[in-house]
Structure formats: C-alpha cells, structure tokens
Amino acid sequence: MRFVGGNKWLALATGLMVACGGTSGEDTTTEGAGGSSADSATTSGAGAGANSGTGGEGVGAGGQGPGPEPAAACQQTTDAIVAATGNTITVSPGPDGQVEVEGQLRTLRAVVRDAMPGDTVLLEDGTYLLPEADPSGFSGVYITTPDITIRSASGDPRAVVLDSAYRIHGGQSAPITVAAAGVVLSGFTVRRSIFHLVHFWDDGDDAVVHDVILEDGGQQFMKASGGNVDGVTVSCSRFEMTDDGRDNVWGYGSQNGNTTCYTGGIDTHDATNWHVHDSSFVGIYCDASGVARPAHGRAPDARNGMTYQGGLAEHAIHMWDAPDGQGHVIERNVILDCARGIGIGFNAEVHDTLILNNMVSSRFAGAREHDVGISVMRAFDTLIANNTVVYTHPEAYPDGIEYRFSATAGVSVVNNLTNQRIRARDGATASLATNVDDADPAWFVDAAAGDLRLLSCDVAAVVDAGTATAEVTMDLDHDPREGALDIGADECTPAP
C-alpha cells in the first residue's frame, strides 16, 4: 500500500542446492561427523546476546532499492528466533580460516559440528573467512545436528559476513550445507562461493532462512537437491549478484564452445511446501560483455581451459517440481534486473503453488540474457494472482507471464498487472480474469528502479478493478485488501 498525494508471520514452531542431475557436493552418509577438523567443542554459558532485529540496507522487500522499510512482521520473526535461544556458543572472527571461542582457535565447521540440538551459535560482528579444504577434506559449515541456530549477535546481516572467498571447500560443497531438520540461519551475510551459497540435502526439513544476505553465488545461490526437502521458509532475505560476482559465475556445458553461465537465486528439486516471502532478488544475470569468464568458476581442476561469455541464468526463484497437495507459496517478493523472475516446473510436474503479490522488473533488453517474469510449466492447480511485472527497455523480452505445455491444468491467472504479454505456449491452457497487460511505466513510482507501487490512485484500469480472490488478503506491503481489489501487487490508498 502506498498513500498517494507490513508480513504475515509464519510461526517459528510450525515453519520452525548442485547441478541438475549432477554430482553432489558432500555425502551426508560419510561426511559431516568428522571431516578434516580434529579440535573439540567448547561452549560458553552466555545468554542470547544482543539482537537489533532485521537490519542492513536492502534486506527483505525493502531497504535500499525498491520497497518499504522492513516490515514489522520481519522483526517479529527475528524476535521469535532470539526468544528461542537456548545454550549459546559465542564465536568471534579469528585468523584466516579460524574463529575464536573462549580464547581458543577453531574452525567454524568444527564449532557447528559439535553443537547440540537446541544450541545457538552466536556470531559476533566481523568477517569470517572460510578455509580452503585439504585435498581429501571439507572445510565448509556442514550442519548435521537438528534444531540448531546460527545467527548474528547484533542482528545486522551486513555486520557479520561468512566469506567463502571463492575457495574450494571440498568437492562441490557450499560454504553452508544443511543436512538436518529444524535449522535456523538468521542475521548474517554469506558470499563469494564457487558453487552454491546455501545447500540443502534431504534431511534439511523445516529450516528457516531469515534476514540473510546471499551475495555472489557461483552456481544457484540456494539449492535443494533431490530427496524431498520439506517445509523450508525463506523470509526477509536478500539475494544479490554484484559485478565482481558476475565475473565468477560458474560456466556449465560441454567443452565445444557451448559453455554458458549457470547461476540463479533459489533452485529446488523434489522439494515440498516451501514458503519464500518478503525477500528481494537483485541483478542475478550473466553478462556477455567484457572478458571471457573462466568456466567452472575458480575451480582450476574443472576448468580445463574452458571460458564462456554470457548466457541465460536460471530464475530468481525456480521450484522444479512438487507432488499433489504439497506445493509452494511464493509471495511478496521484489525481483529486480534478474535474468528470469519466478519459474515453476519445467520437465516435471509441480502442483498447488501460489504466486501472489510479487513485483518483477527489468531495465534490460531481452537478447540472450534476460527472459520472462513469471513462468509456470507443467503446472497443476496453480494460482498466479496480483503480481506486477514491468519491463522498461524498448527491446525487452515480450512476455511478462507465460504458462507452458499441454500437460498444464488448473492454472488461474488473475489480477496481474504488466506491460508485456500474458501468453500461452506449447499448447497450455489456463483461466484468465481481470489482468492488465498494457500498463504504462508512468503509472508507477519508479519503474526503472523496480518500485512498482502506483503513483496515483486515479488509474481506472487498475484501482478497484480486480476479481475477489480468497487467497489474496494483503498486498506487497502487508496492507489489507479490503473491498474491491486493485490489480497488481500494490493496493493503492488515497492520502487521508
């Protein structure tokens, strides 16, 4: 809502990623209990520590860039995480590759490995450089203990940085791997990985990733590999690719010159019941300009002299599949200048997904690096409602929303606002109602910068022109949708 002239909280108690089909990073049956570290656990008796709530510019749907300041509900979730703190293990940055715990130097991997269920690993402000792995070992944070929390003491995600520094952590392992249920990650940054930044394996159910900044993943920033990772919540977080990160994106493909970029935001396989909300995705695309990038990031044993330039990155959010009755909810996210926005399905069926109140914008030409805003493929019983998709480049990709393949069934496309086509492809059918596909960028506060809130409530084609939809009870800003619905992600309210 914008006065011209807030965050539904999923309770902690109830809420509380590898190339497709390729090799996994770490094997959860053999790795994680020991690894290459030999030091023993040391815990402190400190309390929960200070927490200033969600912080840092640009996290959640607001902060720097499009969107309001972080909603009160994001803070409510932060407060719930802090309130749930049990025994704490307080950690501060040490020399390269190490951390300090009660005067002893250890690896963060070992600290997390030795934590007990219910423990909180509390990170003091600073930068934590993760070590390079020994040739036969692993050095990333690998979580195999259920119900532990890793969070910042200050609550400021920009003040606590886990830096992979494009180092090898063993195999294709991530700086953070979740292979246990009920894990909470909150209030810090993880950045500069050759592979994924956060990787879920099949025991990583019911995790919460809240108020986390994920920056410069070499492959998809967050990955869930096959094995039915269920009930993960991603909230009030920021996924961002910088120019430097773009030069280190993983190149993927054959060695005959067809190598192309391989990165994206969230990418899940065999996952169920994920809730991705109130988060932002910025600049996740690959660039054909400039120097040739090294294929396979900075993994010299995998490059074999290969380079690449550009290519179409994965979606900011891509859920490849979900069985009947166990779909995903993707709502109130801001996606700015990413190669593709939200993707559901493709080569497998995905059921029962809700895509609600998201804003997707791009200022780039379509070319070969930028594509559709929202796409559902082989989707069943899926609702795409009250999203706003606006492209400002005169040669932008022509479609804002697509539904694809003849297998697609039970898809409803309702109350969406875009300046691009809403298009059926490959024999797909859907039910369409009260969508607008000829939006004028001048209707919005700042379309080029991704702020797609309505500048005026006098747009008759949009305001009070929507169809009542039971699943849509609030807008992007958590403001209620009362009476006649506006079309798009923003419910416009005249100034008092």
Model-derived segments and spans:
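Ser/Thr-rich, Pro/Gly/Ala-heavy low-complexity intrinsically disordered linkers and tails
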Residues: 3, 13, 17-74, 79
